[in-house]
């Protein structure tokens, strides 16, 4: 999100903040000083847009006052935005010792012996059929359940191209095709094609996230009725769901699909950093 703001207020020519923004006839904006760097039309004094080659005469070039004001506001708020939209290291004291619940895992998910990693496979694992298992969607739940308190965990998505992580209600549908949306009890962020990120709101919310995102931090505060997602590598905020319902337990949720037949990417729950401090404040129900 912070990087998206920076792109909006940055001159595409000199890459400095657009404090003196001007706009060409086509809508292209740059700073006043960079007008001289634009190519002139062959037989006149008009300027050619760098992107669409539309010619702007002198009278077509206007100051972009609203953008100038936006730049000023963002620069003023930037220190506050950094403190609000970044991960608080103290969240880690609520880190949960979490594992995958094999009884809920789709049979085409290959889960490690320590129950902390999985990948998609071609062959069914021949686990017994039961109502709590996802029979079609490539999903698995985590344990423990959460009914109160604050809880934090990290998920390493590695090089996976298609994934979703977050929480879901205990009662979500697990049979047949499922729709990952807040209306159906799923509060998740996910990735498609390794570069398209979105949150499971209705309608879906596009997310501006670094393509190098490999580890997602998730902070669930049942008392405050919110769940927040962070990019652990740089601490940047990804998305927050607020006013979440608390009428039933929440379960950690994970989904993964191979991008191709050769894709051997793995999705993992990260180890607890300091179990002695991470487990004490957590209030949760065991399975």
Curated annotation (Swiss-Prot):
Keywords: Metal-binding, Zinc, Zinc-finger. The keyword Metal-binding applies. One of its GO terms (molecular function) is ubiquitin protein ligase activity. One of its GO terms (biological process) is regulation of gene expression. A zinc finger (RING-type) spans 11-53. Pfam families: PRY, RDM, SPRY, zf-C3HC4_4. GO terms for cellular component: cytoplasm. Gene3D superfamilies: 2.60.120.920, Zinc/RING finger domain, C3HC4 (zinc finger) (3.30.40.10). The keyword Zinc-finger applies. SUPFAM superfamilies: Concanavalin A-like lectins/glucanases, RING/U-box. SMART domains: PRY (SM00589), SPRY (SM00449). Residues 78-276 form the B30.2/SPRY domain. This is Ret finger protein-like 4A-like protein 1. It comes from Homo sapiens (Human). The gene is RFPL4AL1.
């Amino acid at each position: 999100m912070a990087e998206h703001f920076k792109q909006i207020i940055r001159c595409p020519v000199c890459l400095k903040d657009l404090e003196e923004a001007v706009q060409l006839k086509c809508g292209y904006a740059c700073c006043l000083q960079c007008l001289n760097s634009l190519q002139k039309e062959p037989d006149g004094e008009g300027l050619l847009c760098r992107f669409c080659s539309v010619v702007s005469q002198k009278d077509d070039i206007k100051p972009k006052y609203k953008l100038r004001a936006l730049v000023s506001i963002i620069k003023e708020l930037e220190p506050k935005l950094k403190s609000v939209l970044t991960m608080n290291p103290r969240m880690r004291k609520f880190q949960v010792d979490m594992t995958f619940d094999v009884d809920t895992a789709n049979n085409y998910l290959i889960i490690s012996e320590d129950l902390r990693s999985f990948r998609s496979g071609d062959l069914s694992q021949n686990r017994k059929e039961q109502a709590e298992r996802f029979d079609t969607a490539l999903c698995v739940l985590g344990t423990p359940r959460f009914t109160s308190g604050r809880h934090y965990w990290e998920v390493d998505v590695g090089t996976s191209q298609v994934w979703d992580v977050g929480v879901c209600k205990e009662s979500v549908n697990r049979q047949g095709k499922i729709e990952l949306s807040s209306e159906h009890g799923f509060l998740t962020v996910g990735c498609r094609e390794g570069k398209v990120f979105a949150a499971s709101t209705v309608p879906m919310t596009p997310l501006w996230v670094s393509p190098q995102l490999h580890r997602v931090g998730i902070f669930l505060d049942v008392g405050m009725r919110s769940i927040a997602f962070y990019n652990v590598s740089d601490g940047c905020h990804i998305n927050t769901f607020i006013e979440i319902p608390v009428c039933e337990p929440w379960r950690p949720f994970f989904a993964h699909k191979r991008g191709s037949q050769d894709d051997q990417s793995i999705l993992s729950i990260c180890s607890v950093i300091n179990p002695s401090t991470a487990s004490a404040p957590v209030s949760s129900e065991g399975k």
